[in-house]
Curated annotation (Swiss-Prot):
Binding-site list for Zn(2+) 1: 263, 266, 288, 292
Keywords from the named record: Metal-binding, Zinc, Zinc-finger
Species of provenance: Arabidopsis thaliana
Entry protein name: F-box protein At5g50450
Residue intervals of the F-box domain: 19-70
Transmembrane intervals: none
Alphabetical list of Pfam families matching this protein: Sel1, TPR_27, zf-MYND
Gene3D superfamilies per record: 6.10.140.2220, Tetratricopeptide repeat domain
InterPro entries: At2g35280_TPR_dom, At5g50450/At1g67340-like, Sel1-like, TPR-like_helical_dom_sf, Znf_MYND
Entry annotated with the keyword Transport: no
């Protein structure tokens, strides 16, 4: 019995020593470590799990100096796990001056929580600090008059915001600006400059894909650059993934007559009927922007698109026996 008591005393002394070592660490050092964790965490749980370890880590982990550095993946709350606690966490990050949090929470409030005024205000807060995705999202809102009526469209403001985002390197904004210049949409028409911007956007997108490819295959000598099937597609921003999950999960239903943007990497819904543009060829798909339309055309719609007049012709060519006869079509329509 004496031996057991002595062993227990040694274990208790060891635990106390470990605890004392942690308590001896200065708050500034722990905050510095937590800032690096918040920046590099691959998911919210990676960061929040550490905060649940003890009261001191929880207190220091919610320090504004830590939350202001929370990275995009740390803020990547999913629609499935959305709750008052996750909403509160994002608000704490916003109050700490985190511009990624301002953008993400702004998008969620604008499109998911039916609070367009607060959502636009948060996105504007991020845009003022030159946050490229926030600038682009605000430009889409201005182009469509989202959250208001059709008369609330402001094409000149949309072009200005889009140009600023493109200048900061946002590929979707660069592509959108190129289409605006080509079509003279909200800006004097300049076909050659618009074409140049579209080529530049495609080049940047290809460069990003190749960098990702090379980083994935740098240690595999059997793979070559000719194996384009493994070149990764453009990564979807976590907040766009949130929007997709929010409306596709059945958690909430869109109001009657409202539609989602058909581009798989977007997730934006209409805020009023007939807000988004339709494909002028088939009329079956809808897009919040020319950029989304161009990306979806290249990814899948080019194969799926069938002219409306084909269906009319097919209906007219149904014979008396109920069987359809062959109808020739012209498949040379371009990107719409």
């Amino acid at each position: 019995m004496t031996h057991l008591n002595k062993k227990q005393r040694l274990e208790n002394n060891h635990n106390n020593t470990v605890n004392n070592h942690f308590e001896d660490l200065h708050d500034d050092l722990i905050i510095s470590i937590l800032r690096k964790l918040a920046t590099s965490a691959s998911s919210p749980s990676d960061f929040l799990t550490v905060l649940s370890t003890c009261k001191r880590l929880n207190r220091l982990g919610l320090h504004p100096l830590v939350l202001s550095k929370a990275g995009t993946q740390t803020l990547a709350v999913t629609a499935e796990k959305w709750s008052d606690s996750s909403h509160k966490f994002l608000k704490l990050c916003v109050n700490a001056g985190n511009i990624d949090a301002s953008y993400s929470l702004g998008m969620i409030r604008f499109y998911c929580l039916q609070n367009p005024v607060s959502g636009a205000s948060l996105m504007a807060k991020a845009a003022i600090k030159s946050h490229a995705p926030a600038l682009y999202s605000l430009s889409v809102i201005q182009f469509n008059g989202s959250g208001g009526s059709k008369t609330d469209k402001n094409l000149r403001a949309g072009v200005a915001l889009c140009a600023r985002s493109a200048y900061l390197g946002h590929v979707d904004a660069l592509r959108e600006l190129g289409h605006c210049l080509q079509d003279g949409y909200g800006v004097p028409r300049d076909v050659s400059e618009g074409r140049r911007l579209l080529i530049q956007a495609n080049a940047r997108e290809l460069a990003c894909s190749l960098r990702s490819y090379l980083s994935l295959k740098s240690g595999d000598e059997n793979e070559t650059l000719t194996d384009l099937s493994v070149v990764p597609v453009q990564e979807i921003h976590p907040v766009n993934r949130f929007l997709k999950e929010w409306f596709s999960s059945g958690r909430v239903d869109l109001a009657e007559g409202l539609r989602m943007c058909s581009h798989g990497g977007c997730g934006r819904p209409e805020t009023r009927a007939h807000e988004f543009r339709r494909c002028s060829v088939c009329g079956k798909v809808n897009y919040c922007s020319r950029g989304c339309q161009a990306l979806d055309w290249r990814a899948k719609h080019k194969v799926e698109c069938t002219p409306l007049d084909l269906w009319v012709a097919a209906a007219a060519e149904i014979g008396d026996d109920g069987e359809a006869v062959a109808v020739e079509i012209d498949d040379n329509h371009g990107e719409r």
